[in-house]
Amino acid sequence: MSEDMEFENWGSTQSSVEKFCYKWTISNFSFCMGGIQRRITSPVFSSEENKEVAWCLRVYPKGADKESKDYLSVYLVLLSHLQIPVWAKFKFWIINSQGEKYQKIKSPTVECFLTNEQNGFKKFLPRDLLLSHRNCLLPEDQLTICCKVTILGRKYNMPSQNITPAIKDPRHLLTDDLGELWENSLFTDCCLLVAGHEFRAHKAILAARSPVFRAMFEHEMKESLKTPIKIHNLNPQVFKEMMGFIYTGKAPHLHSHSMACDVLPAADKYGLVSLKVLCEDALCRNLSVKNATHTLILADLHSTEKLKTQALDFIAYYASEVCETSEWKSILESHPHLVAEAFQSLASAQCSFLEPKVISGSNQL
């Protein structure tokens, strides 16, 4: 006969788990074959939950080494410089012409990732099989590879005395109400003129959020505030994005690289530290061979150390590709000090680079 037990105290140990998927389409794949160890690298990506950790995928169309020369090799690579390793499981598959998953292979265990270390499958798919079924696996000469990553976070204990009931967010958030004031120009008391476009706003909100606007309003005469305040050297769309952040704390269009590039100087000029950080994060996520040089110049100009470090690391990692761009060739004369810093970063990367680790995968039926 079982007996109910009464516990005077209790607790739990939990581990956070983060999951995300990334889809990568390689166009004109038949022209990317190259030789053994010739690789193709994806754009840098990260999860929505953790923008600090950057990843990329690598594909070796003719294998990562002589042993895999008849296979397609695929890898997941950790790019971020972190103080501790990242433990993660991952799964690769191909999307065929019917939109179906093909050749699903997953890591057999949780793997340890260090900076610049790659884990994956050097014998992911026989190349002859891929080419003989090109209509199905390479529609319009495009290879679409997907990777699902499961990151194991830190374990933490939850004693009973520390657990409190969750409080739901109120239905109408303060930011929504302030956003309505901005969108509908309700009860405004000032007008800002940007490239011929008038924007109605509230001095109190602008002064509370931006030290530059605060100083502007403190030193302006009452009579002059009756006329529109001219805002120079700003695009109306960029100004609108900045004002939306001032009122709501949100900047929904920073996923656009050009928008993030334009908003960053505005955030710096008007003392919007949080918006500046959001721009940094967005630009770090969108680094590419084409824009890395301009991003480095921008980061240096506006003293964004995190973005500058990421740009230097990216340039060091893709040095041969970046050096072929017209943007890089122009920086040799315009910003020689940045070229010197890039070479220092490249030298450090060469010294700390770790040999890739390969794990053998198994087909998942």
Curated annotation (Swiss-Prot):
This is TD and POZ domain-containing protein 1. The lineage of its organism: Eukaryota, Metazoa, Chordata, Craniata, Vertebrata. PANTHER family: SPECKLE-TYPE POZ PROTEIN (PTHR24413). Residues 19-149 form the MATH domain. Residues 188-250 form the BTB domain. SUPFAM superfamilies: POZ domain (SSF54695), TRAF domain-like (SSF49599). Pfam families: BTB (PF00651), MATH_2 (PF22486). Belongs to the Tdpoz family. Coiled coil: none annotated. InterPro entries: BTB/POZ_dom, MATH/TRAF_dom, SKP1/BTB/POZ_sf, TRAF-like. GO terms for biological process: protein catabolic process. Disulfide bonds: none annotated. It comes from Mus musculus (Mouse). The gene is Tdpoz1.
